[in-house]
């Protein structure tokens, strides 16, 4: 990090100017505009050269030291900025605001923008499929206020959360690229371990000033209308976010129009482990392939894709909203109405982010061209929605509206294919502004004007040797030979005498000169002014346009879900008041798409008589798939989607927990078993009788008896909590749980052996599995034949020699648990092995006694 320079007297004037600006932004890289380059100096240069793989050099001296520096062309800055932002860096853009031709000393410069990962809005720097969120948090270990802002859409929300565990789960859900925390928090707190965490001064979170700035932003007297007047901590966090956004953008933020109060009680909560295990929008390898999002997303717009991602990561418990979405999807499916709408939606584009850039006053010409095309497409879109009779769809159609005046304005203003930036002009159409047309005509047609003027003057004066010309010193002129100079008309004003010639100027030529010499720069300046005026006109319509964008995004998602329902054979789930979860012919929506063979659908039935299924069966038999598909079906139902099942009847759930798969946490110093136990503890502490719990192979990673005991106790606890539980295990001993826990039922995934090879049937059947087929799976995996053979020998010996071990005691008042052989017990003791080989009939009494003494010493 750079250190502040207090004594600037020894530095050159240029470096004094640089350090005055840099001292205010020591922890950020500074791009310092000098001519056609952004120059980067000192420690910033060393860091940028390494990150961007550009040459580090040194040029000149200041304060007796050479200046490390590197630079990038200003017209290529976008690519470099994108790379830095992806690396989590923030960049201060310092531009020349003075005129080099008139400046005495260094040209005036000022910071015009600060680009940070959470406040970028440039299309080239953003992932169009993901929200780009920045969050701020305030509070203590008991209660936290969290504010979340997407500056690229204007979405601004607050909520209050109890405890670190819930806060971290919510941060995992929203996954902000920046997280602002108070500077007076002690170091090392869990939130600070997230990438992108930044400390801000405590007064940025001060409640009263935050309340005042938020009211000013939304032009309200208080925040009661947003339902968050009493959320002291959340308001403080929101004020910090607003301050940070203004600081980085250096402009007003008219697209931030409201504050939404979110409540965790309105949602189905998924913790970090559950999101990871269910692979909602990111697979276990960190990619996007073979995720629920990849299967369910055929949205026509990027803003629709982002909204669908939000829905998948925030399933709802509001039955009114869910049923409105179901009705909308049903309406779209009638007569395949979605097919009429989707091509129209494709013409809309990502107007949500375009409108945000307009609000930030950094929209580019191509943004306005896309907005023009979108507004022009709205009438046809409205026509396509005219026969939609679902109330929610009618409301969305009404909100979308049309904007013929704005469409006409942009149609008149912006050329068909504008350049990427306004910098060099050429954006506005001929005919949009008469003065601009005149200036551009002067600039582009100066040569023709001079030819025409020369012809007119020759005709007027009768002087055939008259010439019209130009030089840089004297400008435009009319030249006559000295012999004809006396015949010059009275309106000719002598400008220059040459050997053998005289040069004149006329009022008409002088007027043209004044216009022509500055026409190009004046045309560019006027075009930029007109462009900024156009942006201001659009900002005046920002509120209804943003409402339109939100309505179109939701229409896109709902029509997409209708298309998915048709093409993936999804059916509408039915929510009921009775506590239950009944699925007929359920399928895993992702696995089904990647299989080359038909997917084997399975049923599930949980209700007041059965709250837990103990699932046994071979590895690769489909236990994990069966559990995951249940969770995904329940989750899809809670976003209002149709589900991959012949039928589904369920009550609302409050949480979805998963304890599936194995992974360690090396950075946190936690083993695989420790991670597993932490996830199990979280489930046991937070599950309720409305939660869906998936537990897969609990107890692995420790000794057989420890693991079995933990799994047994965890299963008993969940059964007593009455959570909807799928409990997959290889501990066959757990199949006796139904005898002591009446809400528990056994099911198994079946398989068979054919020609000594295992065949997985993937069918869920009642009762426990008959065997585990572990050796057959190992053989299928390619374990060497000699190892398989030796394993069979050990298995046979274990099955014939292992003694029953003591089972966990039954609870008081419950029947005793039948004893079973432990197929996982350790190998027999060598003494027992030797005893089994003794031929007793061939020994004398003395030999037998001696052998007993010998064996006794080995015990």
From Swiss-Prot:
Classification via InterPro entries: DNA_mismatch_repair_MutS, DNA_mismatch_repair_MutS-lik_N, DNA_mismatch_repair_MutS/MSH, DNA_mismatch_repair_MutS_C, DNA_mismatch_repair_MutS_clamp, DNA_mismatch_repair_MutS_core, DNA_mismatch_repair_MutS_N, DNA_mismatch_repair_MutS_sf
Pfam families, per database record: MutS_I, MutS_II, MutS_III, MutS_IV, MutS_V
Entry-linked SMART domains: MUTSac (SM00534), MUTSd (SM00533)
Record carries keyword Nuclease: no
GO BP annotations, alphabetical order: mismatch repair
Keyword Acetylation: no
Gene Ontology CC terms: cytosol
Alphabetically ordered keywords of this record: ATP-binding, DNA damage, DNA repair, DNA-binding, Nucleotide-binding
Gene Ontology MF terms in the entry: ATP binding; ATP-dependent DNA damage sensor activity; damaged DNA binding; mismatched DNA binding
CDD domains, per the entry: ABC_MutS1 (cd03284)
Residues given in the record as ATP binding sites: 617-624
Highest taxon of source: Bacteria
Region entry Disordered, spans: 799-821
Family: Belongs to the DNA mismatch repair MutS family.
Function statement: This protein is involved in the repair of mismatches in DNA. It is possible that it carries out the mismatch recognition step. This protein has a weak ATPase activity.
PANTHER family assigned to the protein according to its UniProt record, in alphabetical order: DNA MISMATCH REPAIR PROTEIN MSH1, MITOCHONDRIAL, DNA MISMATCH REPAIR PROTEIN MUTS FAMILY MEMBER
Protein name in UniProt: DNA mismatch repair protein MutS
